Amino acid sequence: MRQTKIGILLANLGTPDAPTPEAVKRYLKQFLSDRRVVDTSRLLWWPLLRGVILPLRSPRVAKLYASVWMEGGSPLMVYSRQQQQALAQRLPETPVALGMSYGSPSLESAVDELLAEHVDHIVVLPLYPQFSCSTVGAVWDELARILARKRSIPGISFIRDYADNHDYINALANSVRASFAKHGEPDLLLLSYHGIPQRYADEGDDYPQRCRTTTRELASALGMAPEKVMMTFQSRFGREPWLMPYTDETLKMLGEKGVGHIQVMCPGFAADCLETLEEIAEQNREVFLGAGGKKYEYIPALNATPEHIEMMANLVAAYR
């Protein structure tokens, strides 16, 4: 009997192809049209999206992307490609494809790439450590849509999340320790996760619980007292309430209260991107220092570090 051939699909959110208003507009249109991301009535949402949000937001966001753009593309794309290549080197007999929910390379192109390698079974690893319907759910939906058009489909293993995975927590902890060794131990370690509307959590999305799990496990691995670690949520969009406390408001409050030294990590981001490099490392640094804080460091995402790649290899090992 022929041995089953396994392929790995690394999935992430996506990125514009260029730091231009036109490219950002195309990307945001696809992203903000997904009901998993914005579930508002289409009769209300389409005119607002096309008539107000895209024309006004695209030029501003393009400037932000330009401020962090790298030689090989957006940071998310550069680091995601590095992750794909490093994992392929770690698992030389296993094809590894990269697909994005929005933009290029698409999830469909990633599936087709693996099928062209004659794989019988695809292990899907969404690079979102904490499940949310708006991220992991979107990957699931798109994968189902893609496979629904195939006459023959491969076996599928779908990794829901890895919020409390031992290798993941250890990699985060080692990254924090390295930052403490370099910059000194701060008064507070702030863990900033991407937010979602509070309503999504009220309706059953267990994302906040998964974030709390990671926070608890990381604090335990570091041996830090609970009062020395704080969890917040960033990147809110629109007018409805999102998960709280908000990162920017918390940093302002901490600076005003006399907290002098803060280090910030974003455990929910597997790769550095606009939201970490610009929003957290730059914007929120200014918020904290402007409110009276003295010292602020951003701890980079795990990106393509050896520990992160080893974690990915171990995650998919059960399916190989």
Curated annotation (Swiss-Prot):
The enzyme's E.C. designation: 4.98.1.1
Compartments where located: Cytoplasm
Any one GO CC term of the record: cytoplasm
Top-level lineage group: Bacteria
Keyword Transport among UniProt keywords: no
InterPro entries xref list: Ferrochelatase, Ferrochelatase_AS, Ferrochelatase_C, Ferrochelatase_N
Gene3D superfamilies on file: 3.40.50.1400
Pathway terms, separated by semicolons: Porphyrin-containing compound metabolism; protoheme biosynthesis; protoheme from protoporphyrin-IX: step 1/1
Keyword Iron: yes
SUPFAM superfamilies associated with the record: Chelatase (SSF53800)
EC main group: lyase
A GO MF label: ferrochelatase activity
Family of this protein: Belongs to the ferrochelatase family.
Record's subunit section: Monomer.
General function of this protein: Catalyzes the ferrous insertion into protoporphyrin IX.
Name of this protein: Ferrochelatase
Native organism taxonomy: Bacteria, Pseudomonadati, Pseudomonadota, Gammaproteobacteria, Enterobacterales
